[in-house]
Amino acid sequence: MNRREFFRAFGIGAASLGLSGCASASERRGGNALKGRPNILFCIADDWSWPYASIAGDKVVKTPTFDRVAREGVLFEHAFVSAPSCTPSRGAILTGQWHWRLEEGGNLWSTLPAKFTVYPDLLEKAGYHIGFTRKAWGPGYDEPGGRTRNPAGPRFKDFAQFLQARPVRNSLVGGAGRGGRGISNGARPEGAPFCFWFGSNDPHRPYKWQSGVQSGMKIEDVAVPACLPDSDQVRTDICDYYWEVQRFDTEVGELLNTLKEKGELDNTLIVMTGDNGLPFPRCKSNLYDRGTNVPLAVRWPAQVKGGRVVEDFISLSDLAPTFLEVCGLKPTGDMTGRSFLDVLTSGKSGRVDPKRDKVFTGMERHSDRRAGGVGYPMRAIRTRDYLYIRNFKPDRWPAGDPEGYGDIDGSPSKTYMMEHRDEPGVKRLFELAFGKRPAEELYDLRKDPDQLNNVADRSEYAKSKEKLAAALMAELKATKDPRALGKGDIFDKYPYYGAGAPKESR
């Protein structure tokens, strides 16, 4: 089904396709022009990495809701974030742009300048009822960027309140302030479609120690990632991570039940994904797959054939243009993301679009745990066969200065690796996660899927490395990345708002 056939089948006319953020009065009231448009339920976990879902093959974690969405929709095996860090990753999702284009928004604990258009605002102008609960864009502050609410829209207490057609008494107006924490009393206009962001705080640390084991998980069943040492302490930590993944999955299941009760389940495009990889050494805040590859499943039975597994590369920055196109709007000209509506509606599995053969990722400042508050800038290109990483400041410590290695979240696994760093089974893994790195890294995924053996200096890979480096720099220059234009130090000069920030905006 091509785009024209799709919109004709779904009753979205040509006039709707021409919308660029403007809506008629009838649309704002939820008039006839909106009746054919789907709802959008976007569910994002905090630090959920591929392949930690039962449908992806994990033998311990149980994710029946994600499995259902994937079985009844499309499971994407190669979905990647723009950055393996909360704030820039979520900014890229909302704007449909690479995070390096977002100025301050390219860093953790920052602000997202108001000049960057976000898809919820466009949908709201087109008549959609929008909002979020819990963690949306962030952590960071709205006001320094010129915003009066979170970029994801007004905050609601929960999904039930959001769906109500009348205002809720005794609630705070708007979502303004640091992190947009005020509770909205905005009522859903009758007949209006909605776009809702459910942002769980799971499975972000801290965890309750042994919560996974106490729930019945067995540490001997855990498949320990090759980048981590195999110990009971690490295995127990992973089980605790699994327990929070399961809690996220359960809560999304409750949202689906609510939609079914209201008769809106099958006219809602449902997305389940994560904002970056798991919070363990050499995972989150790194450009290896455990930091950037996230689960992604999309269900929309009205238009998307289910039971499919797609191998195409998808960037989560592709979501914004996809949402806009699904709703009959054109993506804005500054979006670098590319709609994958054609992949969703193709009915195909495997490799669908030959052009989706690679993805780009990057990283700027995560924590401020280096002298001078600087980051560890990286960019990468990931193809089916290779991962190439360019480290722009190899003299810096990628995990943060050794006083605390602050770019790695505190955890029992981190503690174990630091305390046992000189032992034979830990020493090399510690150096890979905590030590300095060369300017270039290259991993042959056909031989090294765990990305532990850097072959960048081997002569037999010289041509492949040169080709990948050229493709990476071409994309960075085409999208005006300051790092590729000799202006990358600007990221280290932007304010860091993490120190003393309120806990509820994390």
Predicted ranges, named:
Residues 2-441, 449-470, 474-477, 481-484, ...:
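Formylglycine-dependent sulfatase
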